[in-house]
Every structure is written in C-alpha cells, then in structure tokens.
C-alpha cells in the first residue's frame, strides 16, 4: 500500500508537469566508455552505509558509536523533516548523514513526487551557472534543513578541530546529500572532503550534472546496488541527468563491483531489467546493510 501510494503520487506529478510544460526537456549525452575496476575505498563505503542506516533508527543519543564514528547531534525526526545525523569520524571527519524516504510520512513521500524543475534557491543560485535546474521536491527537502546543517557542521568542525566534511545519503537523502555536498563546497570555508551517495535518484538537469563534475567530481562517490530502480528516476525525458561516474554492485548485494565512467553510461544499470521493489535499494553495500526502517538498529558496519 505504501509503495502503491508512492507510485501514484509520482505518476500524478509527472502528468501534472507534462500538462503544464514547466520542466526542461534538454537531454545530456551518454558515456560509451567501458567499465573499469572499482577504485573506491570499500571500507569507507561500508562505514558510510552504516552511518546513513542509523538515520532510519530511533536511537539518537549523543555518543552512540557506529563503526569508527561517534554520533554528535541529530536534527529532524523523519516526518516533517528528514532525519540528519552529524558524526565525528577519524576516517571521514565531520560526517553528515541524511535519511531517505520515510514511507510512513506523507510529507516525505511528496518530496519524491514533486518532479518539476526549478531554479536553485536564492541563497545559493549565484554560485551556479545560468540554466541550472533542480527537482523541486528534493530541493525543498534540503532547504528545510539547510541552515541547521550549516550551523551544526561549523560548530563541530570548530569543537573537533576538524577540517574535513563528508556528506552521506541514501535514496531521497542521497539527492539531498548531493545538494548539500555542493552547497558545502560552494559556500563553506574549507569546502567538501568527500560524499558517498547510495541509490541516488537524478537531481538536476545536464547543466547541473556537468557543474557537479566540475566542482566535486573527484570527491563524488555514487553507489548503485543490483537492480535498484531508484537511480533511474526522475526520467531523462523530463530533462534530468546524472553526474559522471558510479560504482555498480552487480549482482546485487555482492562484493562484485565496477566503476562506470561518464554521465549515464550505456553499459551499466540500464542493461538489466529493473525490479520495482526495494530488495536491492535497501540491500547490502560492501558488507553493511542499508535496510531503512526494516534494517538493523543500531546499524552494524561490516556485519554481512
């Protein structure tokens, strides 16, 4: 029922957008480069997966240990606003982990369904190239938390004498995380250290995707598991485009993975049929489960 509600909301949004013709139809290119061996640090991916899994858990007491990381602060509760955990990690620095869709929250569901494109928020539009467009729902979800995230990150960077900031997200939280990672790179002293994004949906148009490549391409880590369908939405036909490079775990929930270079690589995830369930979206990412509300609480890094 919850999944059906999401699908109906999504298709209703597409119909409304199509009728009003308020989205961009520009379509970016597709990479034809062959995949290469996974160059990413899989231990860091495993840790990042645990840190974002914990955002789905109700245990939010400061001092909680997940992997090498200590939970410092939590904002949002997953209903009116997505939950965001702030950690300190010897591996990742100050780590910002953002929860994905809470299917028990209509507000959270609606963020996924608002497919139309809009300009970047007035707070950061000056940093983006002309013509940049972002999905309304994902940007709205991030803007609800933007000021609190910046305040907390600045506070804990100072308290922990830490220069590194890593942003992590899953699903809706991955889209929010990409926008947050760009915002930190563009507007915060010291910029971004890394970002790890799991099951990332498309966030913006080709202008945005290419600007991500330009600004944080060497810090950007997108991980897709198996036949996960979430990274295939919103559709490219609506003017959306992924930034370059993703690691594809295939078969799903295994440790077999390759990097697919460039934007929208033709040899990757679209070569296999999608499965419209959450078995791979909420799966095992290099020995750590991201199971959302049905996952392990507290999160267990490297337990699989």
Swiss-Prot record:
Gene3D superfamilies: alpha/beta hydrolase. The keyword Disulfide bond applies. Transmembrane segments: none annotated. Its main location: secreted. It catalyses: a monoacylglycerol + H2O = glycerol + a fatty acid + H(+); a diacylglycerol + H2O = a monoacylglycerol + a fatty acid + H(+). InterPro entries: AB_hydrolase_fold, Fungal_lipase-type, Sec_MonoDiacylglyc_Lipase. It is found in: Secreted; Secreted, Cell wall. Residues 1-19 form the signal peptide. CDD domains: Lipase_3 (cd00519). Optimum temperature is 25 degrees Celsius. The keyword GTP-binding does not apply. Disulfide bonds join 57-297. Induction: Expressed on human scalp. Residues Thr-101 to Asp-119 form the lid domain that covers on the active site. Upon absorption to a lipid-water interface, a movement of the lid from closed to open position is triggered. Belongs to the AB hydrolase superfamily. Lipase family. Class 3 subfamily. This is Secreted mono- and diacylglycerol lipase LIP1.
């Amino acid at each position: 029922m919850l999944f059906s509600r999401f699908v109906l909301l999504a298709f209703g949004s597409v119909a409304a957008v199509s009728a009003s013709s308020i989205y961009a139809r520009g379509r970016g290119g597709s990479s034809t480069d062959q995949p290469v061996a996974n160059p990413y640090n899989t231990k860091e991916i495993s840790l990042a997966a645990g840190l974002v899994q914990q955002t789905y858990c109700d245990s939010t007491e400061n001092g909680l240990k997940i992997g090498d990381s200590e939970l410092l602060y939590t904002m949002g509760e997953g209903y009116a606003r997505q939950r965001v955990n702030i950690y300190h990690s010897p591996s990742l620095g100050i780590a910002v982990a953002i929860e994905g869709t809470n299917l028990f929250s209509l507000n959270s569901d609606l963020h996924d369904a608002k497919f139309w494109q809009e300009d970047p928020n007035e707070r950061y539009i000056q940093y983006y190239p002309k013509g940049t467009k972002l999905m309304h729902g994902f940007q709205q979800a991030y803007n609800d938390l933007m000021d609190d995230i910046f305040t907390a990150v600045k506070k804990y960077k100072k308290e922990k004498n830490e220069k590194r900031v890593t942003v992590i997200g899953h699903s809706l939280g991955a889209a929010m995380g990409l926008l947050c990672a760009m915002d930190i790179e563009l507007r915060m002293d010291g910029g971004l250290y890394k970002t790890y994004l799991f099951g990332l949906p498309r966030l913006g148009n080709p202008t945005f995707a290419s600007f991500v490549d330009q600004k944080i391409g060497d810090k950007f880590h997108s991980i897709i598991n198996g036949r996960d369908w979430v990274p295939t939405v919103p559709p490219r036909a609506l003017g959306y485009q992924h930034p370059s490079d993703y690691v594809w775990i295939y078969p799903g929930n295994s440790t077999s993975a390759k990097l697919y270079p460039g934007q929208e690589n033709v040899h990757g995830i679209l070569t296999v049929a999608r499965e419209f369930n959450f078995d791979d979206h909420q799966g095992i990412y290099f020995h750590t489960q991201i199971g959302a509300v049905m996952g392990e609480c507290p999160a267990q890094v490297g337990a699989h």
